[in-house]
Amino acid sequence: TTVHRQNRIINNIILETTLDITPKTIVGFENHGGRTYSNYTPLGNVLVGKGNNDTDGVEGVVYKNYIGTYLHGPILPKNPHVADYLILKALQNKYEVESLEKLDDTIEYLAHEKFLKLYNK
């Protein structure tokens, strides 16, 4: 269930994700007026920011092959492990693929780590 509120949630955000990926953190930006309440598995637990609403400490939803989130901006470039997860799941939906060829994500992970260091995480 999502309800609209006049005051927007505008924050940088850091999650500890429920996805089977490494690292376990997802960094991003949230800017939304909606407050979402769900019984589905969350994308992650909020370490910094507000998430789905101002009360339950979670962000996003994971249901089957679907991921919903309020995170936006450069979420995939700052979280290459999330990009790899999405690409792998999409390929596995049609093909017998077990893993992706590793790419050099050094710069992307530096951006991810710099974001975490801003909040001592």
Question: Which ranges hold each PLM region?
Answer:
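Pocket-forming structural segment of enzyme catalytic cores
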Residues: 1-59
